[in-house]
Amino acid sequence: MTHQRRPLGTFVHARSGDKGGDANLGLWVAHDGSTHRDARVEWLLSTVTPDFVKTLLPEAAGLDVEVFALPNLGGVNVVIHGLLGAGVAASTRFDPQAKGLGEWARSRHVDIPGELLS
């Protein structure tokens, strides 16, 4: 199986936000008519682990990351504990509400099996 290095957002969508000092990140494969949707969902569910998230988003390294599989929705929910410090009012981050975290994750390059890209 050959892999190609592509942005995660090639076929993965995202939404993100804050809950106190934690960041919440939803990643899913849309129903776009692709014959590869089921295989893409399977790849996403098996690929997105706490370690994967810490590599994908270096600012999450050293933090507690939880990943919840949502197979019926074709995605995962990721909680990054403590990413926002004491919360939006006290955060010094450029994106204190983690609203841009989803697009940042989608822009990051990952190894994707070639057969999922056609």
Feature-to-residue mapping (PLM):
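Long, contiguous binding/interaction regions
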Residues: 1-118
